């Protein structure tokens, strides 16, 4: 069964929204990661050829204490890339809103409930953090590397074409980034805007051709997580780096932003540095 068919049958995307009045964990819609990975010719009977996570920031998160007083926080959810499922974004939004009128002893009780529900849906332990005070909010940052967007190019390709990628014989270690990433929701067609950062060691990637490849996603319809995995696999196969990390930070929609990270390196630390567009 295709990803689109699963979504059309089960998702609230593109449908009239009815917001829950009470705690509703059943609203969470898990989607098998294998559905997309098969289209990338990834052997789904083995562990994926990358490590990483999907980091979600939730900006519309609230609940009641035992006296009925509302509390608000920013939520940070880290789902391992090795999990069997991802969570469909609108179902996540509705699930979070189901906490609005629920009473809890404290923030820890809320986060523990969310961790339990999410971990059950994706079949792996999900990390849940709450940011409760302004002093905990990370400042915006700029990647330490070369901005591709300053390059003057001509392009008329707006669907992913890995054949655009090319390399030279020189071996380098460098970080490249762009704010020109745009893809689209596969169900509603809504645009997804983001910034992408690529760090690698290997044959030097042609910067002009890489920017063209990034822009070629402009009319492509695929989820955030799937787009980043497509980026990763295309660069890995066509450019043959010894080391590769691809991460994207998408702008928020419905009070959520999604930030997938994929790497050949099994040792990494989760960094939630917000881009200036977030």
Curated annotation (Swiss-Prot):
This is NADPH-dependent 7-cyano-7-deazaguanine reductase. It is found in: Cytoplasm. Catalyzes the NADPH-dependent reduction of 7-cyano-7-deazaguanine (preQ0) to 7-aminomethyl-7-deazaguanine (preQ1). It comes from Coxiella burnetii (strain RSA 493 / Nine Mile phase I). Belongs to the GTP cyclohydrolase I family. QueF type 2 subfamily. It catalyses: 7-aminomethyl-7-carbaguanine + 2 NADP(+) = 7-cyano-7-deazaguanine + 2 NADPH + 3 H(+). Keywords: Cytoplasm, NADP, Oxidoreductase, Queuosine biosynthesis. It comes from the Bacteria. Residues 255-278 are annotated as: Disordered. One of its GO terms (biological process) is tRNA modification. SUPFAM superfamilies: Tetrahydrobiopterin biosynthesis enzymes-like. Homodimer. The keyword Cytoplasm applies. Substrate binds at residues 87-89, 224-225. Its EC number is 1.7.1.13. GO terms for molecular function: preQ1 synthase activity.
